Amino acid sequence: ITPEEIDIAISDSRGLFYAAQTLQQLAQTDGQGNTTLPLGVIKDYPDVAYRGTVEGFYGDPWSHTDRIEQLRFYGKMKMNTYIYGPKDDPYHSSPNWRKPYPEKEAAQIKDLVKEAAANKVDFVWAIHPGLDIKWTDEDRMNVLNKFGMMYDLGVRSFAVFFDDISGEGAKADKQADLLNFLQKEFIEKKEGVSPLIMCPTEYNRAWAGSDYLDVLGRTLDPAIHVMWTGNSVIHDITLEGQEWVNKRIQRPSYVWWNFPVSDYCRDHLLMGPSYGLDPNAAHAMSGFVANPMERAEASKVALYGVADYA
């Protein structure tokens, strides 16, 4: 920024959008309506390719209005990812994950996809089939068909969650078979689709007592992202922890950070700053999303820190 002009060097349209956000945030208007910008050079780029939030908490899901406002906030804060996975949406999880959304909810998904695009945010729709999935060709096609329904609503980014389940649905080899099928028959065949994301059943180090993660590492298509919460469900993110899991899954993990989520302490508002994030760990992850509170506006304080970190 010089007295004569503003030069912007970008690599894509998202970069231009972010540059505009920076200029708007720097602009100052005096009492006479004159707007000024500080002079200087600004170098602004992310440390993590995919960064934002995962609506993955237990409790009342955000309202449609909450989600629209959140997407606008993410654009301003230069976060490019919103993963839709509210645990209490019956069409995301059981009992209705096999079924299409009703007309009203389908229209809202379309609205969210449109608003996300306007704010340069990837709207990622997640399915959570593990509570009652049958490892049959019929249910394999049910997942594929549900992805097709969401694609027709405008969704271009997808995730499959196998968290917080037990029994038949928690088998690593069966999960990998399904995910590899989706990768081959949907992700690679549909136009404009982003890499597939999965949340494993053993999603933190404290629970990783079997060969589950090793099976995923060996058998899962390397293009598929694998999520991870750290050394426990709620934990600091450290370089040592990232290196441990990355070796097991044979790829950089996609961090699901459980802050400021408060579904384990519902009588609290977690509005402090984000902390416990090792800046040296950012290069050892493929993505970083925070799980917020069911109180959307109150979550913005911590999410600001997430944007600053990533």
Tell where the protein language model's regions lie, with residue ranges.
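Feature activates predominantly on carbohydrate-active enzymes
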Residues: 2-146, 152-156, 188
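Catalytic-core regions of glycoside hydrolase
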Residues: 28-31, 57, 146, 153, ...
